[in-house]
From Swiss-Prot:
Protein name in UniProt: Dicarboxylic amino acid permease
Family affiliation: Belongs to the amino acid-polyamine-organocation (APC) superfamily. YAT (TC 2.A.3.10) family.
RNA-binding among keywords: no
Keyword Phosphoprotein tagged: yes
Lineage: Eukaryota, Fungi, Dikarya, Ascomycota, Saccharomycotina
Transmembrane segments: 91-111, 120-142, 157-177, 202-222, 232-252, 286-306, 323-343, 373-393, 424-444, 455-475, 502-522, 531-551
Biased composition (Low complexity): 54-64
GO cellular component: cell periphery; fungal-type vacuole; fungal-type vacuole membrane; membrane; plasma membrane
Amino acid sequence: MKMPLKKMFTSTSPRNSSSLDSDHDAYYSKQNPDNFPVKEQEIYNIDLEENNVSSRSSTSTSPSARDDSFAVPDGKDENTRLRKDLKARHISMIAIGGSLGTGLLIGTGTALLTGGPVAMLIAYAFVGLLVFYTMACLGEMASYIPLDGFTSYASRYVDPALGFAIGYTYLFKYFILPPNQLTAAALVIQYWISRDRVNPGVWITIFLVVIVAINVVGVKFFGEFEFWLSSFKVMVMLGLILLLFIIMLGGGPNHDRLGFRYWRDPGAFKEYSTAITGGKGKFVSFVAVFVYSLFSYTGIELTGIVCSEAENPRKSVPKAIKLTVYRIIVFYLCTVFLLGMCVAYNDPRLLSTKGKSMSAAASPFVVAIQNSGIEVLPHIFNACVLVFVFSACNSDLYVSSRNLYALAIDGKAPKIFAKTSRWGVPYNALILSVLFCGLAYMNVSSGSAKIFNYFVNVVSMFGILSWITILIVYIYFDKACRAQGIDKSKFAYVAPGQRYGAYFALFFCILIALIKNFTVFLGHKFDYKTFITGYIGLPVYIISWAGYKLIYKTKVIKSTDVDLYTFKEIYDREEEEGRMKDQEKEERLKSNGKNMEWFYEKFLGNIF
């Protein structure tokens, strides 16, 4: 059984990681020195003599000889290499754009309906704190040595089996998200054009063709397109926050000053049901809200996927991490705080949206707008929802293809998915991801909104499992740095709290993963569909990890044996070159005066 499986992939099976040599064998066994073309040396401007890279065809098993084959980042030849065309502004906007979608615009309505305003605010704030620590840990690793996705970090710093598990768990998540977003887009359009007039499959096809075209032409165009699309989303969110603030103060047409009225009546917390009341009922509702807060934040960790295509990642990744954290505070916490003040959890309009489609009619923002007496904005808002869904689907398809590519590069998926086009697009991985988008046609039915909620459950679990893995990998990475005496003060970015913050976030991420759907046990009838969709990610993750470990007999890499140096010199040099370019840019900005470029760098660059 082993041989056919091994032949499918680019690498032979990893061996036990009991030394630095065996760790290199385990993680880089797929890298054949003869596969690297000489022109790779020119592309990365590497002085082979200076870096002691003298023989790529050496058959020596010593670390130095084997390291010679790793002079080119990622060990990829011209046909399996991504293009480093993403700037810091692209990375941060792709990350925030991938998470600003239906989860925030529409999912907040279900969260408010489930737990009440304060329960929703606390849940979003707490999950936001976990996201902050997770992003910080990811940022430290990604800015030290950027690798291709989570699977590469897990395989290199912990265990190849963990890399396999998170790689496929994350892949399944992003096989599900694009078709689900396409379904949501078709449902949004039904706000204007009913399914009786135009079959939703028509809209799905149109959106799919456009999104595939954007992903095919290369990451530079994709990054620029997504930057402007996400910038529009940022502007919309800022506008909505301002509008909610005005409505709360009584600035709407009805001039009704709301203040904290709905926190008092009907209350800050909602009881779960008539059977579970009082403090117990409110606590149950509070815990139930975590499902929706998780879904709203999912995708914000995309920085770890796109950093391998980043220009000067040691500068761009930390900046993207910091900007993402600021946006969490503004977009998520300000939004849910103001929503809880403008809409009561027992509002008739909000109650009437329960179980409805993902159009503007199901959004708490529209409820707040309509309650204030504004008539025309719901149609404009629905158009904004459509843009949000389109952008999220665009990012999701990108991540799906890049994650499959990373698995292939790491030797954990068929090598055919590692091939890239002349624009640096992993076209075979993209084709398979597009094929899964066909699931969207199955979702277009009268019960599609219910199916969407089931997918929310699945994606939420896959999302938090990816956060758990990032935190585990960081803990091992930090332990290896301390064991090998690496001074973190010289890092481009260091996570606040470091391992203590990681342990804190890991504990609560695991706790939330275990209890997030416990409400299925509280009703009179066991909701097996919600239970299965809510927890199916756990057995998938565990079976993937255990199966790979049993087949390939891998072991957790010792802290003293973890490879913390391969590719480091290349990124050190790239960082130095980037610093020189930044100095030239600063001098140019000073000489040119305060023009638009200066204005963007100093002000707009901190927003977009």
